[in-house]
Amino acid sequence: MTRQDLVLFRPRLALLNGIAAVAGHALVPDAAHATLWVALAGVAILAAGGSALNQVLERDLDRLMERTRQRPLPRGDLSPAMATALGCACIGTGLLVLAAGGPVPPLLGAVALAWYLAVYTPLKRRTSLALAIGAVSGALPPVIGWTLAGGAPGDYRIILLAGIFFLWQVPHFWLFQRRHADDYRRAGIPLFTPGAGRLGPSFHVRLWLGALAASVLLLPAFGLMAPRMAPWIAAVPLLLLPVCRPRSEATLFSCLNAFPPLMALALLLR
């Protein structure tokens, strides 16, 4: 496998998922540092395997899109069987790593993976709401990190953090979809257009970003983030509000990529 073939695993997206797990782990007081690395590695490897299987399932769509036609499967550099084997190997490894924290973390990992592959992936072809539905699986990595550190999965604190990551994903991936709208139309994938009407897309991006900032500002009230840190993290989406214009969407997307690492850092320093 060449360096170019690593796109099968989408390493940057896998790392973002691992960082989200670190954010959840950081919420647990006095959690062991060793399990933090388990959360990062286990979730990232699991996400890499999920990306590989997703590309096997969507290889027909990838051939139609300019952005994805140079991936290993559309190019013919890897067979679907080989890509499936590599994906399953990553998934098995990721689940084994997560099992170091007991049965709950790998169970949650399996649920997130099943939601991504069995719910989001087929719905992506059928409905524009798939983007919001798929965000559920992306909200689970913080919960996995939390349970690895010994937290209960139903605790209100981790539910709040998972909700914040859900709010982050929708504008983040919506902007990504809008940047590649022509590709999506070429492949026949319905575009997510929340509240389409006279208000226009900029209004709805601002609405999601405002909700994200407000949720972050709630964290100190529950003792989940140092009061001095919350305004700085909330500033990431708030500072983007004035530039919510079509020509600024690439900048918005890139800036929103910084949100999970900043959240994880703020929670680690609380």
UniProtKB/Swiss-Prot annotation:
Pathway membership, UniProt: Porphyrin-containing compound metabolism; heme O biosynthesis; heme O from protoheme: step 1/1
GO molecular function: protoheme IX farnesyltransferase activity
Record-level GO BP terms: heme biosynthetic process; heme O biosynthetic process
Catalytically driven reaction(s): heme b + (2E,6E)-farnesyl diphosphate + H2O = Fe(II)-heme o + diphosphate
UniProt subcellular location: Cell inner membrane
Gene3D superfamilies the record matches: UbiA prenyltransferase
Membrane topology label: Multi-pass membrane protein
EC number: 2.5.1.141
Major location (coarse): membrane
Enzyme class, first EC level, given as a word: transferase
The entry's keywords: Cell inner membrane, Cell membrane, Heme biosynthesis, Membrane, Transferase, Transmembrane, Transmembrane helix
GO CC terms in record: plasma membrane
InterPro entries the UniProt entry points to: Protohaem_IX_farnesylTrfase (IPR006369), UbiA_prenyltransferase (IPR000537), UbiA_prenylTrfase_CS (IPR030470), UbiA_sf (IPR044878)
Keyword Lyase: no
Annotated TM spans: 13-30, 33-53, 95-115, 129-149, 156-176, 207-227, 249-269
Function: Converts heme B (protoheme IX) to heme O by substitution of the vinyl group on carbon 2 of heme B porphyrin ring with a hydroxyethyl farnesyl side group.
Family: Belongs to the UbiA prenyltransferase family. Protoheme IX farnesyltransferase subfamily.
Extra remark beyond the main annotation: Carbon 2 of the heme B porphyrin ring is defined according to the Fischer nomenclature.
HAMAP family documented for this protein: CyoE_CtaB
Protein name per UniProt: Protoheme IX farnesyltransferase
Designated gene of the protein: ctaB
